[in-house]
From Swiss-Prot:
SUPFAM superfamilies: C-terminal domain of alpha and beta subunits of F1 ATP synthase, P-loop containing nucleoside triphosphate hydrolases. Gene3D superfamilies: 3.40.50.12240. Keywords: ATP synthesis, Hydrogen ion transport, Ion transport, Transport. Signal peptide: none annotated. This is V-type ATP synthase beta chain. The keyword Signal does not apply. The keyword Ion transport applies. GO terms for molecular function: ATP binding; proton-transporting ATP synthase activity, rotational mechanism; proton-transporting ATPase activity, rotational mechanism. Belongs to the ATPase alpha/beta chains family. Produces ATP from ADP in the presence of a proton gradient across the membrane. The V-type beta chain is a regulatory subunit. It comes from Thermotoga neapolitana (strain ATCC 49049 / DSM 4359 / NBRC 107923 / NS-E). GO terms for biological process: proton motive force-driven plasma membrane ATP synthesis. InterPro entries: ATP-synt_VA_C (IPR055190), ATPase_F1/V1/A1_a/bsu_N (IPR004100), ATPase_F1/V1/A1_a/bsu_nucl-bd (IPR000194), P-loop_NTPase (IPR027417), V-ATPase_su_B/beta (IPR022879).
Amino acid sequence: MAVKEYTGLSEIRGPIVVVENVSGVRYDEVVELILENGEKRTGRVIIAGENVAIIQVFEGTEEMDIEGTRVRFLGKPLEVSLSPDLLGRTLDGLGKPRDNLGEIVPEKTVDINGSPINPSAREYPRNFIQTGISSIDVLMTLIRGQKLPIFAGNGLPYNRLAVQIARQAKVTTEEEFAVVFAAIGLRKDDANFIVRSLEESGAIKNMVVVLNLASDSVAERIATPRVALTIAEYLAFDLGMHVLVILNDMTNYCEALRELSNYRGEVPGRKGYPGYLYSDLASIYERAGIIKGRSGSITQIPILTMPNDDITHPIPDLTGYITEGQIVMSRSLFGKGIYPPIDILSSLSRLMKDGIGEGYTREDHPDVASQLFSAYSRVMEVRSIASIVGEEDLPEIDKLYLKFGEEFEHLFINQSFDEERSIEQSLDLAWKILSILPETELTRINREYIKKYYKASDET
């Protein structure tokens, strides 16, 4: 399609500009805006009318003059350059190098919006991805092709958890594995911590970091997760790699979506978010999966901060409808000094049942996970009773459950930022803690596994 150029804008509204008396303009078309001083900025068409185009400008509209700005419609959608050389690189939210290591010679360029996976071509997710974190690997196992979000509150260490997962994640087979880390609207100190941690550990060699700072434009923020997923699709379905995509923080993405919606003058929905928030999030989350006949996979961990710790807020609420489980971070565990402070009873992985056990992790894994959930639930009940009657008046079995709860939180859930545990180490640790309880309490575990792994402690 031919390039069309116009001079002058009709209106500037925040990161939005309006151009009138145009023709043949398409929705999602890339636009080049040339300021009077020769500076070039990039935008895309978000509304294409009969003779008007509304454009969101990725670099912002500061110092842009209404009369002197030239607008070029390039006749193509926003694309990202793809190459195996992307591994080890840090890019901006539009997929351009940010690490001063030179330009990337593209093998191909692809529209960042991708295309949805045909449901009939999807393969059911199986096989697990080891994160090296006991509570996740044993109790809410991440499965290849799954989308498993992390719900956190402000002030909780979700950035540390994201970095630890990115650094330690691996597949237990000999297949190739990579991580795409999209930092969306993060403060500079958080972004520096993430990049520095990944570089110092050497993990960045098998990663692509797509970095959008809080100081970058909200328009670029909308593109960031799509750029990251387009890169992931190339690594997975062209190069045959298993790819884990970490999207941190999707709340910042949704705030940017709300801001742009307000600039457009759209009718707001719940809490001011646009009515299409659900379908917009689905267009991102549903790019995870496995395609029949292809060797790669895309697994997603979207991370989002819940305003006021409200899990019913539209962002976590709608995310929960689209994804396959959730990992919830606990403020009370964080207050006890436990890291990662994962709320076990509020978290689950809906696909773990099909990717654990014999042939995947270890034969006792499903039973151990079920027993840990059951026992920890009993711990919560006993703690409630103890807060009323006191621990001294509890029966001996309840005192054992209290001891189990303390050991479970401080030895199993709690692990240091630099500690990586294999699935075997995590399961062995689970058995050690379960052995605090009498054998008769392990009602959810096959007798064969009890004989093999159970070792009664002195308390029992």
